[in-house]
Amino acid sequence: MSDSAPTNPTPTNPAPEESASAVATLEPGPVSQWLNTQGFDHDVLDPDHVGVEQIGVESAVLPIIVAAIKSHGFDYLQCQGGYDEGPGERLVCFYHFIAMAEQVEAMTAGRPHELREVRLKVFLSREGTPSLPSIYGLFRGADWQERETFDMYGIEFEGHPHPKRLLMPEDWKGWPLRKDYVQPDFYEMQDAF
């Protein structure tokens, strides 16, 4: 028996060119389909590990798309955060929305209802000062969440009413959750106090 890959493609082992084309043609989820009918430009991303629809948007149109999905029933910002794809790679800002009013209405009426949820992602260059518009004006719950993302990753939120650090001291240098962060020498910090 050979250790090499099978030479004949099967449904479970497609040919390499079939695999590449399958990845390139993701099926848009229901929110993405709705955004298409409304004329909003966005990217279809793979669903997450539990099947939540994920959509990529440009930072300039983030507030417009957030307002649109809010009017489409996604009335609750469950969480906002960021992550670093790795040294030299992009920073990512994500927003997870759920249709809370629909869920409450269904539960009150005793009807089974599957929770509608969607996650928006904005991909940012780590060069310079990454920034995007704040959605605080649409969702007040974004206040501390955007501040934490700024504090840990250095992503600025334009138009945020309280643009200051949340967890770290105001004079802290750097962004502690970035993969390229160089931690200050612990003993030098200890001597400062």
From Swiss-Prot:
InterPro entries: NADH_DH_suC, NADH_quin_OxRdtase_su_C/D-like, NADH_UbQ_OxRdtase_30kDa_su, NADH_UbQ_OxRdtase_CS. One of its GO terms (cellular component) is plasma membrane-derived thylakoid membrane. Belongs to the complex I 30 kDa subunit family. HAMAP family: NDH1_NuoC. It comes from Synechococcus sp. (strain CC9902). This is NAD(P)H-quinone oxidoreductase subunit J. It is found in: Cellular thylakoid membrane. NDH-1 shuttles electrons from an unknown electron donor, via FMN and iron-sulfur (Fe-S) centers, to quinones in the respiratory and/or the photosynthetic chain. The immediate electron acceptor for the enzyme in this species is believed to be plastoquinone. Couples the redox reaction to proton translocation, and thus conserves the redox energy in a proton gradient. Cyanobacterial NDH-1 also plays a role in inorganic carbon-concentration. Signal peptide: none annotated. Residues 1-21 are annotated as: Disordered. It is a peripheral membrane protein. GO terms for biological process: photosynthesis, light reaction. One of its GO terms (molecular function) is quinone binding. Its EC number is 7.1.1.-. Keywords: Membrane, NAD, NADP, Plastoquinone, Quinone, Thylakoid, Translocase, Transport. NDH-1 can be composed of about 15 different subunits; different subcomplexes with different compositions have been identified which probably have different functions. It catalyses: a plastoquinone + NADH + (n+1) H(+)(in) = a plastoquinol + NAD(+) + n H(+)(out); a plastoquinone + NADPH + (n+1) H(+)(in) = a plastoquinol + NADP(+) + n H(+)(out).
